[in-house]
Amino acid sequence: MYLDADYKNKDEKFDAQFDDLVPSLMFSYQLAPTQSLRASYNMRISRPGIWFLNPFTDTSNPTAISYGNPDLESEKAHSLSVTFGSFSQKFNVNVSANYSFVNNGIEQYSFIKDGVMNSTYDNIGKSKSINLSLFLNWNMSPKTRFNINGRGAYVDYRSSGLDLKNHGWEGNVFGSFQQTLP
């Protein structure tokens, strides 16, 4: 992707080119007729929008100015996962483990220079997470079914340029019981 901008009444000009290779790999192995094991790697990109890149300085409030950063790179999110699945008429089970990370997240930050608040953007964000998830469907009888779906994760967010960080556990569980009446 290529961006180019010229401004009327301004000597500023900027351009940005994004040539991102976005790989994706998946391997699958059938352990038995009803069981499989999958491993995958995926990368997603998030390209900065024009306002993130635009170097034009908004001085409508002289005590707080904002401008873009034409040197921003695409944010790259990487994900590795392993999934086991087992399916039969009575039980369906899916268990997944996933590790995801971003080392160049696009973040807005502000700083004071010469008594003026400056706001702009940079690739200063970092995040990583480890996720475990489980899906279970149990057909207890032809008229009775039980489902449970759960996920737990440890997440770690950091902003190197701002010396900010946050980490902790998160999760959710959903269950259902279905009974068909005569």
Task: Give the label of every model feature segment.
Residues 1-28, 33-78, 99-119, 143-154, 178-182:
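Surface-exposed extracellular loop regions of Gram-negative outer-membrane beta-barrel proteins
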Residues 18-24, 65, 75-77, 127-129, ...:
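Membrane-spanning beta-strands of outer-membrane beta-barrel proteins
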Residues 26, 30, 36-40, 77, ...:
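Membrane-spanning beta-strand positions in outer-membrane beta-barrel proteins
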Residues 27-29, 43, 84-86, 136-138, ...:
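Residue-level signature of outer-membrane beta-barrel architecture
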Residues 35, 78, 84-86, 144, ...:
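Polar/charged side chains located within well-ordered beta-strands of beta-rich proteins
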Residues 69, 73, 88, 92-174:
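Outer membrane beta-barrel strand-and-loop segments of large Gram-negative receptors
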